[in-house]
Amino acid sequence: MKADQVAALKKSFEQIETVGQQAGHYFYNSLLERNPSFKAMFTGDMDLQVEKFLSTLKLMVHSFESSKNGEYHLSADLRLPLKNLGKKHQELGVNSEMYKPVAEALVGSLEKFSGDAFTPELRKAWTDAYWEIADAMKTHQ
């Protein structure tokens, strides 16, 4: 990712944070409506799940570091926790094919709550960030 993409993610997340609970519930409702088989994985308190989701999203946008070539990548310090998170997700029944519907629900939710600010460039930044996180989570497999 480039510096302008990381800056755009941070600015976008600030906007999303103002409607965090609403956006988080929209994300999960969208995900579960499109993928009913996922519902069995979400048996707990959805308000708590939304809080975890928003915390993870915030951590994500603030965890990209510049490398020598000017590209931004996930902080090396975050890779092991993400690997462990991926392992926990796998133990809950998440497989590699499930990451794509999550990406679609995430980007769709971000678009809904960003309005006109959700440009094609911002879509690409969020998509790239998501897949870097997802790929780190899948390294345990």
What does each model-identified segment do?
Residues 1-141:
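Globin-like tetrapyrrole-binding proteins
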